[in-house]
């Protein structure tokens, strides 16, 4: 959901997989 976009911004420069 919205939390996913927040996570993507924080880990934009890193490879971070997040299921939301």
From Swiss-Prot:
Presence of keyword Membrane = no
Q: What is this protein called?
A: Alpha-basrubrin
Q: What Gene Ontology terms for biological process does this UniProt record contain?
A: defense response to fungus; killing of cells of another organism; negative regulation of translation; xenobiotic metabolic process
What is the purpose of this protein?
Possesses antifungal activity against B.cinerea, M.arachidicola and F.oxysporum but not C.comatus and R.solani. Inhibits HIV-1 reverse transcriptase and cell-free translation.
Enumerate the residue ranges of region (Disordered).
Answer: 1-20
Keywords (alphabetical) are: Antimicrobial, Fungicide
Q: Where is the composition biased (Basic and acidic residues)?
A: 1-13
């Amino acid at each position: 959901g919205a939390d996913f976009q927040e996570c993507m911004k924080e880990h934009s420069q890193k490879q971070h997989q997040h299921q939301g």
